[in-house]
Amino acid sequence: WDVMLCVSGTAIACENALVVAIICYSPALRTPMFVLVGSLATADLLAGLGLILNFVFQYVIRSETVSLLTVGFLVASFAASVSSLLAITVDRYLSLYNALTYYSERTVLCIHTMLAGAKKLCLGLLPVLGWNCLRDRTACSVVRPLTKSNVTLLSTSFFLIFLIMLHLYIEICKIICRHAHQIALQQHFLTASHYVATKKGVSTLAIILGTFGASWLPFAIYCVVGDPEYPSVYTYATLLPATYNSMINPIIYAYRNQEIQRSMWMLFCGCFQFKVSFRSRSPSDV
């Protein structure tokens, strides 16, 4: 299981390092929307590196201090990844719901994102600062050396974020359907292309939220109901799918974007000149 987590971490690190490099390489991608995508890729990149370091320190350098640092690093990285997903969801919702005041509200969103990042950093430091079960084995959770209260706090935070994202994506779907209906009224009928576009948009949102929930919900639920006496295979079996979310994120939020695809080709094939001008997409684009 540790080898599988290490392999997963390597794949996550490689995928997201490429996204970060592409966004840093192309000036056309240095827009607020892509900054959020870049922050998500950076968090997932750090999570992948954390999985690799965890494997190395488990089998090469065994130390309680190093173990705590690695666990804290992983907690902060994955928490930052989930928070970045929430920030992207809020950004897309605001771009659709309040299009006229969107750019003024973006500043507030950026401030909240930075505050959330500071909070996740604090969550990662808690095990290092003493909130661990190294001295009291009875307080251990299914994720050693985190305590039961620690993982309960993390799981509760995840459930809250998941519910907020679920609510926002439902509202986004309503807005999409409402816009399609308004277009149909203006044109006196709903064309096949509008129907297909609406159906595709709703399906994509369902896939995004479904992937996120399927990846993290089993692990979050097991952290709450699991007992440290249970076989560790249960922990690994629920943790591994959670890491897959960081592997899927760059595919959903980056590689499917046409601007990033063009920048990727320019990064690898700098000799080619693209005549297509770069246009910053609306953050509501999925």
Write out the residue ranges for each language-model feature.
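Extracellular TM2-ECL1-early TM3 structural module of rhodopsin-like
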Residues: W1-C6, T10, P32-T89, Y93-E105
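First transmembrane helix
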Residues: W1-S26
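Helix-to-loop junction signature of class
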Residues: L5, G9, L46-I61, F78, ...
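Alpha-helical transmembrane segments of multi-pass membrane proteins
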Residues: G9-A11, G38-L51, A79, T113-V128, ...
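Helix-boundary and loop/linker segments of multi-pass membrane transporters
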Residues: Y25-R30, Y103-R106, V142-K148, A192-G201, ...
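Fourth transmembrane helix
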Residues: S77-A87, L94-S141, L160-E171
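Seventh transmembrane helix
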Residues: I164-M165, T211-V224, Y236-V286
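Intracellular effector-coupling site of seven-transmembrane GPCRs
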Residues: K174-F219
